[in-house]
Amino acid sequence: NIIEQIENFNIKNNNIEISTTQKSPSALDIDNIHSELYSEPKDAYFTQNPYCIYPSENGVDFAISIDEAKNLLKEDKEECSIPLKVLYPNITTSMLGNEAFPDLLSQYSTSYSTRDQKRTTNLKLAANKINGTVLMPGETFSYNKVVGARTISAGYQEAPIYVSGKVVDGVGGGICQITTTLYNAVVYANLDIVERSNHQFVPSYAPASRDATVVYGSIDFKFKNNRNYPIKIMCTVSNGIANFQIYGLRSNNDYEVVISNRVTGTTSNAIYSEAYKILKQNGQVISSTLLSQDVYKRH
């Protein structure tokens, strides 16, 4: 049978002839490439019934005309590169107004000295980067990614920072107060903390285990939107008050959040502390979750 013939076939003693045909490659069709690549930017919008937010999307297009792209192919080159450009929507997700984020989920404030103008400048620069940020469900916020590098060219000033257990002047000093204020607002909104670190010393603007520090490139503050709907972060730095507000849509499953922090021990060189997130409903404690256990150096 056929199977036996195949098994008994010895390729070394038999020649196999395969007919081939030569065919030139198809010419590149710029119009077709453009139609497959091109995408329109999409404006953000929302509906109230049912409640749903549709985020904005960037588009893409040739950075040159189609005729210019076709002329590139006529050049005698082995490779041809067509530059591209991003098309931005007219209405981004962060531009959606209060109607899209009707409920105040949480807010938190810390105070700062307006006499230190350089530090105040740093606070405002960092806050402005975060203000208006929208997080979709499941999306993670990275402080370092959103705020970016703290450099002189970005407008940051030298102000006191903690380095190797000492207080020295450094570019961007003070922005950890923005991190700390946001951290507390995030906890009160009952969002998931992904990454958070405490300072070397207990800062003046927050009690032990209620702070959050960042160092660009090494220490970040991250949290995740664990809600079913998008949230929007609003912040202001004015008249000695740094304030964060987180907006979204409340649900029947939301709890009252209480943060309980305490110093658990001290030595001549260190302070030990911890913080818990307590969820309440109708005055009854539903759960108590450890947020952090921290160690600080004494000044």
Where are the predicted features?
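Aromatic-residue-lined binding/catalytic grooves and analogous aromatic/hydrophobic interfacial grooves
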Residues: N8, K12, I33
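Well-ordered beta-sheet/strand-loop patches within structured domains
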Residues: E4, T21-H299
